[in-house]
Design a protein with these regions (language model features):
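Short N-terminal signal/transit or membrane-insertion segments
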Residues: 89-116, 176-205, 331
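Helix-turn-helix/homeodomain-like alpha-helical modules used for DNA recognition
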Residues: 71-149
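Basic, Lys/Arg-rich alpha-helical nucleic-acid-recognition elements, primarily the DNA-binding modules
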Residues: 1-79
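Exposed alpha-helical structural elements
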Residues: 7, 25, 36, 87-90, ...
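Generic detection of long, well-ordered alpha-helical segments
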Residues: 2, 16, 89, 204-211
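Hydrophobic protein-protein interaction segments
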Residues: 138-309, 313
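Long, charge-rich alpha-helical interaction segments
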Residues: 320, 324-331
Length: 331
């Protein structure tokens, strides 16, 4: 039993911000003295089941995380989405909250293996952002309010528009390593093509503006890779935040994100098209980081001086966008 409590306390420490006094927080939460808290932290006194429930609820720790004592068991937190507008607002809030959570810890870094276009990029380009949020909610979540409408007829809920800049701004502040392959934009291009062929656009100008935003994303990624810094295309401004990019010829297989710092880590695995499930499990994080490092070692650097490789990589993706553009123009 003591081993489980030791494991739980270590998990608790990894789940709290460094500026928080854990002992004082627990004292207030459990309504016990600091001395009683320290006895629990030193495993001299057992943490009761009711106290465990209260702690897990307060610090957003799943009870299943106690299984971390067994390296073959992993607990995940998911964003439970429905077909309501409020549900997607919560998705954006969680996205923003998780990035802010990692920002609290020293030497934070984000590694993103992108089977699909990293979600953050959409939010810098309004036409593409509108399309993707409509696609996710209409076609994936089956939102009733969006059915039977074309893109031009849809107005996004104000709560979505309020959250998008928050996610965008925090992303610009986090040092990032991205792994792309030739198919990273393929799904977005296919989704746009499907909506065009299905009659969900009233005007060619709408889809052409979305394709122009895809060009803009490639320009943004190119500028970031060339300078090794984050870039905001809205303000045409570079940030002194590290950015590196790799082109991978291997099949990535799934969107995989690893948030790391000196003291805290979290892994995110994509599911249901655009959603993510998160784990703070130490063993899973070690495995995930090892896989990502291996993918990087087998990839081609596209940042800074790798101009030839960078140009070749993006040229092929530009060609895929232009192919759909010509199809629309000739239709």
């Amino acid at each position: 039993m003591e081993a489980i409590q030791v494991n739980f306390i270590e998990l608790l420490k990894r789940s709290t911000a460094t500026h928080i006094s854990l002992a004082e927080e627990l004292s207030e939460l459990l309504k016990i003295s600091l001395d009683s808290v320290y006895r629990r932290l030193r495993c001299e006194t057992d943490i009761t089941l009711s106290e465990t429930f209260a702690i897990c609820k307060h610090f957003n720790i799943p009870l299943e995380a106690l299984a971390e004592i067994n390296s073959n068991m992993v607990a995940f937190r998911i964003n439970k989405l429905s077909n309501s507008a409020e549900s997607f607002s919560q998705y954006l809030q969680v996205l923003h909250g998780d990035l802010n959570w990692m920002m609290k810890y020293p030497n934070h870094h984000l590694i993103y293996a992108a089977e699909d276009l990293p979600v953050f990029y959409h939010f810098f380009f309004p036409n593409l952002a509108l399309f993707k949020m409509v696609y996710w909610n209409k076609s994936i979540l089956n939102a009733e309010s969006l059915q039977g409408k074309t893109i031009e007829e849809i107005q996004l809920p104000p709560t979505w528009l309020e959250e998008v800049p928050k996610v965008r701004d925090v992303f610009l502040k986090i040092p990032t390593t991205e792994i792309w392959n030739d198919d990273t934009l393929k799904s977005s291009i296919q989704q746009i093509k499907f909506y065009w062929e299905a009659g969900f656009f009233q005007k060619k100008e709408t889809i052409l503006a979305i394709l122009e935003d895809l060009d803009g994303i490639l320009a943004m990624a190119t500028k970031q890779a060339a300078m090794g810094k984050k870039y905001n295309p809205i303000k045409d401004q570079y940030y002194d935040v590290e950015y590196s990019m790799y082109g991978c010829e291997l099949m990535i297989g799934n969107n995989t994100v690893f948030l790391t710092s000196d003291t805290h880590q979290a892994s995110y695995i994509g599911y249901n098209s655009f959603n993510f499930m998160r784990s703070n499990n130490r063993y899973f994080n070690e495995s995930n980081e090892g896989w990502l490092r291996n993918m990087i070692s087998k990839s081609t650097p596209l940042s800074l001086v790798a101009e030839k490789s960078r140009n070749q990589f993006f040229r092929a993706i530009y060609a895929s966008i232009d192919k759909l553009r010509q199809q629309v123009l000739n239709d």
